[in-house]
């Protein structure tokens, strides 16, 4: 009988500019740690990685502080359109929804599609799926995001994206919003899964597609799993998540795979971050931006990346 594996977990709430105000940083830390604590308890109880990933994404989507689910940013026309995907590493199966509106948890639609012959749906298909699933209509708008959009409309949308995090004292004043949430889990059976969800970059052209609903930003195999956050176009151009996972599959350690991928990203002036696990339980994160809002459980304790030095950096725990 195969012995059980020590589960591992890492989550993120986006990446962007450094947080201003210690009170705000501590609020973000408490939120991330609470999610890690709840989801890790599920993993210890024996649930599989995909179930844990969905639960983690639900909790993060329900937190108005982050740009996914409740608190998603508004697009140029003032509407919220969200995207999410999940990939089961053991099955090698990806599913997702693109630009869905009026649902509380887009990750639930992505999860449902895991067992569908049509596993990635655009806006109309996602809306029809929500009706088929009898998911109640939900307004994900928050007052902070509405005021952010109104201000940008008055300024004729000078910024190219919204703030990464919705805190009155923390709302970004530069083009630095990179809001996404993601969860990567290794369960007691040694299986990996990853989920990523986003409200988009904010103020974007109608129809823009996020990396969060593509393998480029959310990818897993039986060897490794990666969730990305940052400028979606940069993530797509680097094909970041598959690049890291394939390097692990080809024999590099997770740390070396992250180091090489982020060195290339730095040279290419990319703007993003990523979190990752491998099948051996190694935990890793990387960023080219100021900060990545990540927290993890290494099997013994909870840690986070909220106070890393500014600039390109990769870290890992074996």
Curated annotation (Swiss-Prot):
Signal peptide start-end: none
Reaction(s) the record says it catalyses: Cleavage of a beta-linked Asp residue from the N-terminus of a polypeptide
Binding site for substrate: 208-211, 229-232
Keyword Metal-binding attributed: no
Family: Belongs to the Ntn-hydrolase family.
Function: Degrades proteins damaged by L-isoaspartyl residue formation (also known as beta-Asp residues). Probably performs the final step in the degradation of the reserve polymer cyanophycin (depolymerizes the building block L-beta-Asp-Arg). Also has L-asparaginase activity.
Quaternary organization: Heterotetramer of two alpha and two beta chains arranged as a dimer of alpha/beta heterodimers.
Protein name (record): Isoaspartyl peptidase/L-asparaginase
Organism whose genome encodes this protein: Nostoc sp. (strain PCC 7120 / SAG 25.82 / UTEX 2576)
């Amino acid at each position: 009988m195969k012995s059980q594996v020590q589960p591992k977990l890492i989550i993120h709430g986006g990446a962007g500019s450094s947080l201003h105000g210690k009170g705000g940083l501590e609020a973000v830390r408490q939120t991330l740690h609470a999610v890690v604590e709840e989801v890790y308890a599920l993993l210890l109880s024996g649930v599989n990685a995909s179930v844990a990933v969905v639960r983690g994404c639900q909790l993060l989507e329900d937190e108005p502080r982050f740009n996914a689910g409740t608190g998603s940013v508004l697009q140029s026309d003032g509407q919220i359109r969200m995207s999410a995907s999940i990939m089961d590493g053991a099955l090698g199966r990806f599913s997702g929804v693109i630009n869905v509106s009026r649902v509380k948890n887009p990750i639930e639609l992505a999860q449902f599609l895991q067992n569908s012959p049509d596993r990635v749906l655009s806006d109309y298909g996602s809306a029809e799926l929500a009706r088929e699933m009898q998911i109640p209509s939900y307004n994900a708008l928050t007052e902070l995001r509405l005021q952010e959009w109104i201000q940008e409309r008055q300024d004729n949308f000078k910024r190219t994206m919204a703030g990464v995090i919705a805190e009155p004292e923390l709302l970004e004043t530069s083009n630095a919003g990179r809001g996404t949430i993601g969860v990567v889990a290794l369960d007691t059976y040694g299986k990996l899964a990853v989920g990523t969800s986003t409200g988009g970059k904010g103020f974007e052209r109608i129809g823009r597609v996020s990396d969060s609903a593509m393998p480029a930003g959310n990818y897993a195999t039986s060897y490794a799993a990666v969730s990305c956050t940052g400028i979606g176009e940069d993530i797509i151009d680097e094909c970041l998540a598959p690049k890291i996972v394939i390097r692990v599959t080809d024999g590099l350690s997770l740390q070396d795979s992250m180091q090489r991928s982020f060195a290339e990203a730095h040279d290419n002036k990319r703007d993003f971050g990523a979190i990752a696990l491998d099948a051996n339980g190694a935990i890793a994160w990387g960023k080219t931006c100021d900060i990545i809002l990540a927290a993890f459980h290494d099997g013994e304790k909870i840690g986070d990346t909220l106070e890393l030095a500014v600039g390109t950096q990769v870290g890992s725990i074996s």
